[in-house]
Amino acid sequence: RQMCIRDRMPLTEALRNIHFPTNPDSLRRAQYRLKFEELFYVQLNILRYAKDRQRRYRGYIFERVGDVFNTFYSQNLPFQLTGAQKRVLKEIRNDVGSGRQMNRLLQGDVGSGKTLVALMSMLLALDNGFQACMMAPTEILANQHYETIKELLFGMDIRVELLTGSIKGKKREAILTGLLTGDVKILIGTHAVIEDTVNFSSLGLVVIDEQHRFGVAQRARLWTKNIQPPHVLVMTCLLYTSDAADD
């Protein structure tokens, strides 16, 4: 705020000084004024788009924390959650219970707890009668997520399936049928999950890992799997972060 006040210059004066500066300081202030205005309107348009999108897309309401989440928390949780993980989970619960479609970014280093937070978010969907899907950019990463989540859910009666391009024939048909009937509760896969033949009974939450490796159209196709778009949780790994939520 202090920078804005100190370097504030009327638009007409800024336009004049950008072409005919009276001194180096006037040129700097004019450049700052014009750059600030450009960035301000970019941010304003982003905010306007976000508000408009919230009005147009209502989200499913996850009203309850039920037996699935509580059983996992009390019996299967491999370690105590960190303060950051608890805070992020609370924010996610607020989002999915607000009536607006969640579109949240979850960032953290490798091993910081992102996958565990994503799984517990998916369990919230299951508790409220919905399915969940996780999409990863490669078969190797999808397999890693599948094995990790299967291990974390060991002993719980939750059908988790893996769908990649290499899964074909009867096994693939069984997975697709299970998605339609609702027997498959959690689907983990690659780009294969956005194919036209993949349809859900009630998809409530989509988790996307490393979203920068998917195109906008590819990510958006998951939203069309329901009449009403599901909640979206995007996981990304940054080199430096203080906001952590386990790969």
Model-assigned labels for residue ranges:
Residues 205, 213-242:
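Post-DEXD/H (motif II) to motif III coupling segment of the RecA-like Helicase ATP-binding lobe
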Residues 1-7, 240-247:
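Conserved small/polar residues in nucleotide/adenosyl-binding loops
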Residues 124-145:
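Conserved SF1/SF2 helicase motif Ia
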Residues 143-167:
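Conserved helix-turn-beta segment of the N-terminal RecA-like "Helicase ATP-binding" lobe
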Residues 162-172, 190-195:
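Conserved helicase motor
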